[in-house]
Amino acid sequence: MIATARLKYLGVSAQKTRLVVDLVRGKSVGEALASLRYSRKMVAKDLEKLLQSALANAQQKDPKLDVDRLVVARATVDDGPPQKRARARSMGRIYRILKRSSHVSIALDVTPAKAAPRAAAAKR
């Protein structure tokens, strides 16, 4: 892993966040940023900032790094702690509302250089 970035306590449920994270996992950084920029999901803007942060971390770590070779190697979404709210209902009852949150982690890595096909594999 070249660089990582974490976004904790994001105020969107992990289920909704995973829908957008699945779009960028395994893509190059340029493709992932374009996908997030034109996504209509609300969480895409936060994930775009997170990806920009991971990219800045990679450039800070190695200034000579070729940014075009970076890919989203790992992207995980975990449940965060829910905020508990109450809603008044009839006959003096209270229903609990859970405002869910999530933790997002992104790791960038360099794509390996494509090796030439082996001679033995070519003979088969």
Give the location of each predicted region.
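Structured, basic alpha/beta domains of bacterial-type, RNA-associated proteins
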Residues: M1-L23, K27-R124
